[in-house]
């Protein structure tokens, strides 16, 4: 198998290539007006790793962040590349964290990201059925909470995830 560094490099090289070929790979989740109202929203962003075939299922990767910073480029890129190799379109979410963001900010960002992908499914070439959430550490906790109808997907009015993959989720 490949080393972690080789997998990360392959993922970053792929993103650079699709960007060079004209595909947008970064998407802010909030408008300038929404960011002006809540400046912490500027941190929320999606990184897009397109599938090779249209109509692919999609996954959202939620990296861990030690509750202080987001690790989407470490865990997110390598996981995105591995899922891409399995036929998925993958989005790595940089979600808001920290005291200034507030307790529900990561859930709000995840719901916004899911809605954004669903609303733009044709642009991204993805199926809207049975999306996956894959989270590491605090991202795993976020995915797990979001899998609960009362606190997650149902509260935010988005479809229920088809699968949750929780890698060492933390518990506060």
Locate predicted features.
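Short beta-to-alpha linker loops that shape the active-site pocket of alpha/beta-hydrolase fold enzymes
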Residues: 65, 94-98, 170
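Short beta-strand element of the alpha/beta-hydrolase
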Residues: 56-65
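Catalytic nucleophile-loop/oxyanion-hole region of alpha/beta-hydrolase
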Residues: 71-75, 93-128
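Short amphipathic alpha-helix adjacent to the substrate-entry channel of hydrolases
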Residues: 73-91
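Primarily recognizes the serine-hydrolase "nucleophile elbow" in alpha/beta-hydrolase
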Residues: 112-172
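N-terminal carbohydrate-binding/catalytic regions of secreted carbohydrate-active enzymes
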Residues: 43-47, 70-75
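N-terminal cap/lid segment of alpha/beta-hydrolase-fold proteins
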Residues: 1-54, 103
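Stable alpha-helical elements in mature extracytoplasmic
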Residues: 8-11, 75, 79, 106-113, ...
């Amino acid at each position: 198998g490949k080393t972690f560094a080789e997998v990360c490099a392959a993922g970053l090289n792929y993103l650079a290539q699709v960007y060079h070929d004209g595909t947008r790979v970064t998407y802010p989740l909030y408008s300038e007006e929404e960011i002006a109202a809540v400046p912490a929203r500027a941190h929320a962003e999606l990184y897009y790793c397109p599938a090779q075939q249209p109509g692919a299922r999609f996954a959202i990767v939620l990296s861990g962040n030690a509750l202080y910073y987001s690790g989407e480029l470490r865990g997110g890129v390598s996981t995105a590349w591995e899922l891409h190799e399995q036929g998925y379109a993958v989005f790595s979410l940089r979600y808001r964290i920290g005291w200034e963001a507030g307790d529900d900010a990561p859930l709000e960002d995840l719901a916004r990201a899911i809605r954004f992908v669903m609303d733009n499914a044709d642009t991204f070439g993805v199926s809207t059925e049975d999306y996956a959430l894959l989270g590491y550490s605090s991202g795993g906790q976020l995915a797990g909470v979001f899998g609960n109808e009362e606190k997650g997907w149902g509260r935010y009015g988005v479809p229920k995830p088809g699968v949750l993959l929780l890698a060492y989720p933390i518990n506060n």
